[in-house]
């Protein structure tokens, strides 16, 4: 199963992220190395949200990420949510569905 971690970023995110970015990126790359985090990054124009794609049997990896993320701990993330995502197309789809 896939899970989307969606961050609503604070208005001053770009100005403040520098001091926390290395720790945040280490956390993300470590989650990727464990096979939990597939992709992640901020949306552009405007930079008001970020989306991280996790895979696993439950949303636990995404929730652990949030609990450890310096962006969340230091107020760069105003709100967050984890949503299950039923992926049906693509090589790594969790529930592949092909045309009949």
Predicted regions and their residues:
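Conserved, structured core segments of small domains
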Residues: 1-100
């Amino acid at each position: 199963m896939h899970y989307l971690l969606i961050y609503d970023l604070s208005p001053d995110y770009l100005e403040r992220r520098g001091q926390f970015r290395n720790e945040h990126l280490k956390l993300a790359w470590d989650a990727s190395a464990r096979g939990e985090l597939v992709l992640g990054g901020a949306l552009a124009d405007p930079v008001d949200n970020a989306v991280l794609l996790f895979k696993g049997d439950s949303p636990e990896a995404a929730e652990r990420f949030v609990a450890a993320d310096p962006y969340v701990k230091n107020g760069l993330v105003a709100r967050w949510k984890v949503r299950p995502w039923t992926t049906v197309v693509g090589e790594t789809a969790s529930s592949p569905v092909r045309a009949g």
